[in-house]
Amino acid sequence: MAFEFKLPDIGEGIHEGEIVKWFVKPNDEVDEDDVLAEVQNDKAVVEIPSPVKGKVLELKVEEGTVATVGQTIITFDAPGYEDLQFKGSDESDDAKTEAQVQSTAEAGQDVAKEEQAQEPAKATGAGQQDQAEVDPNKRVIAMPSVRKYAREKGVDIRKVTGSGNNGRVVKEDIDSFVNGGAQEAAPQETAAPQETAAKPAAAPAPEGEFPETREKMSGIRKAIAKAMVNSKHTAPHVTLMDEVDVTNLVAHRKQFKQVAADQGIKLTYLPYVVKALTSALKKFPVLNTSIDDKTDEVIQKHYFNIGIAADTEKGLLVPVVKNADRKSVFEISDEINGLATKAREGKLAPAEMKGASCTITNIGSAGGQWFTPVINHPEVAILGIGRIAEKAIVRDGEIVAAPVLALSLSFDHRMIDGATAQNALNHIKRLLNDPQLILMEA
């Protein structure tokens, strides 16, 4: 009987995912924990590892297709594993295959296989298993995170006796084994990605007087659409548009750009804006709130996490700079660059897109100026930044050319009054006009 592997519950309340890429094809041989596919939901790209060792029989879902949790996505010829899917509630409900899923951003690398060849080592404690009795072909039931934890601790997981359901190895088993005096395991081998399955043939060109095509919305695009509609239907938006002379800011960045580069950091204007917005959230706490629409309660946030909207090929993602009030401009700049790279590569972990106090969105990178950004509900404000353009301004009674930054602040009028929003925007402008104040006040 073939082993049918169903799309597992990957948490975060996600019930479906798009098969972005298959790393295996029919007739490929796979081991436990070899990466089978990348699945993209509205939170992140997730790697799906194999729960069995065997041969791939059939890919049930093509690349680019959305599969639902519980749907069979691949079948294996896996002798000895056929009963794994019929173990009953103890196994399926407790682990529910979600234990076999690992976020690419959380892991930071592909799931690795355990080294098959190990040299016997001397036992040094009561908890040590007899090294000579280890079966190199022993099948181990364990979460990828537990396997990774075992590798980090230098433990050959095949030597550990599992205490979980059906002999599943848990972290506590690894700790007990280590406390018993385990020797370091041999270096691991990284599972090499296998050839991808052939892509389906391109759809025929549309014909007729008004040619059209239809395609399913991606998981990320559906999530964006739902969030935008919910925000506009829930929060009465008002947008203030202003501009600020950033002559001193441009000079300050130029002065410290090389200092940052010497530390491997690309210094942009965005971290200055993050610090200015953080200062505004402190000075005007109403901007750092949200409304519980079910209980009609106001939630005051006592943390300062700034979301940074990032434009990617697959849609808009919002990674979050945590505790921006405790970080320097250099630290924030480095973190933003790292998060932006992850966003473009589709490797953001769900945890890296949670917990924002307020969000910044940058239309200036696309050459825009003023716009009406949509609030990232349940936040109550969003700061939009446009391009820096040379403009004629009046300074000391004279008309001079100066770099001017366009700013747009959208706010939820249920929580924030217009004057309060303008005062907050004025505070941001003051700090960006004189970046020395960021050191003093932000």
Swiss-Prot record:
Residues 2-77 form the Lipoyl-binding domain. One of its GO terms (biological process) is tricarboxylic acid cycle. Residues 182-208 have a biased composition (Low complexity). Residues 84-97 have a biased composition (Basic and acidic residues). Residues 141-178 form the Peripheral subunit-binding (PSBD) domain. It comes from the Bacteria. The active site is at residue 413. The keyword Acyltransferase applies. Pfam families: 2-oxoacid_dh, Biotin_lipoyl, E3_binding. Residues 84-136, 182-215 are annotated as: Disordered. One of its GO terms (cellular component) is cytosol. It catalyses: N(6)-[(R)-dihydrolipoyl]-L-lysyl-[protein] + acetyl-CoA = N(6)-[(R)-S(8)-acetyldihydrolipoyl]-L-lysyl-[protein] + CoA. PANTHER family: DIHYDROLIPOAMIDE ACETYLTRANSFERASE COMPONENT OF PYRUVATE DEHYDROGENASE COMPLEX (PTHR43178), LIPOAMIDE ACYLTRANSFERASE COMPONENT OF BRANCHED-CHAIN ALPHA-KETO ACID DEHYDROGENASE COMPLEX, MITOCHONDRIAL (PTHR43178:SF5). Forms a 24-polypeptide structural core with octahedral symmetry. Belongs to the 2-oxoacid dehydrogenase family. This is Dihydrolipoyllysine-residue acetyltransferase component of pyruvate dehydrogenase complex. The lineage of its organism: Bacteria, Bacillati, Bacillota, Bacilli, Bacillales.
